[in-house]
From Swiss-Prot:
PANTHER family: LARGE RIBOSOMAL SUBUNIT PROTEIN BL27M, RIBOSOMAL PROTEIN L27. One of its GO terms (biological process) is translation. Coiled coil: none annotated. Signal peptide: none annotated. This is Large ribosomal subunit protein bL27. Keywords: Ribonucleoprotein, Ribosomal protein. Pfam families: Ribosomal_L27.
Amino acid sequence: MAHKKAGGSSRNGRDSESKRLGVKKFGGEAVIPGNIIVRQRGTKWHAGANVGLGKDHTIFALTTGNVDFRKKANGRVYVSVMPKAEAAE
């Protein structure tokens, strides 16, 4: 009787797709309106000046400028966009 014993089925082998969270534009980098600066769950980073906060807590640029990360006395890190100085006309 040349039979093989039935192989057991594994209960593992599943994983969720990564969400690609984190900082997308770092301090000092140039951004234009609409650029995503941080993708996050909750507010690990808080919205500062010239940035918007999406419903999924994504921080994005509202103006052209450079990204600035600042830690305040309350311990929170605020992300802002420092506008570029307009050329004198």
